[in-house]
């Protein structure tokens, strides 16, 4: 069994972490993030690191241990480096562009799809078939990418649709006559 929770999370210079009640707040050069703390584990901030320990040896407490440590690590990475995902659009006439606070997608429907860009997320379209999503919250960046991809998932015959950069689409052969 993995014991990722044993490793303390180092807090780099320029980042401050504070525990107030049941909330851990992390402030860094890119912004501020916070999570609510689980009751199954205890947290300690000491000399430039945050350590997470289970309060008892139950299966539930041990399962929360590694997850909560990873969530703390994601907060620190988010406020220092940020997260980004890239989507590739494949298909004749499929394109995307940013117009103000909306992402306009042309995906072969009879109408254009307007996707409202949420707060804390930046979307850029370097070209018409590439969408770059970035932000400091890993969960929110992934959620926005999944919502955009949901409008036209890649199909296995021609590969048309929206896919993550680097994603492999399993291709099928068409019917034979």
Curated annotation (Swiss-Prot):
Family: Belongs to the universal ribosomal protein uL6 family.
PANTHER family: 60S/50S RIBOSOMAL PROTEIN L6/L9, LARGE RIBOSOMAL SUBUNIT PROTEIN UL6M
Classification via HAMAP family: Ribosomal_uL6_B (MF_01365_B)
Keywords, alphabetical: Ribonucleoprotein, Ribosomal protein, RNA-binding, rRNA-binding
Any one Gene Ontology molecular-function term assigned to this protein's record: rRNA binding
Protein name, UniProt field: Large ribosomal subunit protein uL6
Origin organism lineage: Bacteria, Pseudomonadati, Pseudomonadota, Alphaproteobacteria, Sphingomonadales
Organism of this sequence: Rhizorhabdus wittichii (strain DSM 6014 / CCUG 31198 / JCM 15750 / NBRC 105917 / EY 4224 / RW1) (Sphingomonas wittichii)
Designated gene of the protein: rplF
Pfam families registered for this protein in UniProt: Ribosomal_L6 (PF00347)
Function of the molecule: This protein binds to the 23S rRNA, and is important in its secondary structure. It is located near the subunit interface in the base of the L7/L12 stalk, and near the tRNA binding site of the peptidyltransferase center.
Signal sequence coordinates: none
Subunit and partners: Part of the 50S ribosomal subunit.
Single GO cellular component term: cytosolic large ribosomal subunit
Top-level taxon in the UniProt lineage: Bacteria
InterPro entries: Ribosomal_uL6-like, Ribosomal_uL6-like_a/b-dom_sf, Ribosomal_uL6_a/b-dom, Ribosomal_uL6_bac-type, Ribosomal_uL6_CS
GO biological process annotation, one example: cytoplasmic translation
Coiled coil: none
């Amino acid at each position: 069994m993995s014991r990722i929770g044993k490793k303390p999370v180092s807090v780099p210079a320029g980042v401050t972490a504070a525990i107030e009640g049941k909330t851990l707040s992390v402030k860094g050069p890119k912004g501020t993030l916070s999570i609510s703390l689980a009751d199954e584990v205890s947290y300690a901030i000491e000399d430039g690191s945050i350590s997470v320990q289970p309060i008892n040896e139950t299966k539930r407490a041990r399962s929360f241990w590694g997850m909560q440590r990873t969530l703390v690590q994601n907060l620190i990475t988010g406020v220092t480096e940020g997260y980004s995902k890239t989507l590739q659009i494949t298909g004749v006439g499929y394109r995307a562009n940013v117009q103000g606070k909306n992402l306009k997608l042309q995906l072969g429907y009879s109408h254009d799809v307007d996707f409202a860009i949420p707060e804390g997320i930046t979307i850029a379209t370097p070209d018409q078939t590439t969408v770059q999503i970035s932000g400091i919250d890993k969960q929110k960046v992934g959620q926005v990418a999944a919502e955009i991809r949901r409008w036209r998932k890649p199909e296995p015959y021609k590969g048309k649709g929206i896919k993550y950069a680097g994603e492999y689409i399993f291709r099928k052969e068409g019917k034979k006559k």
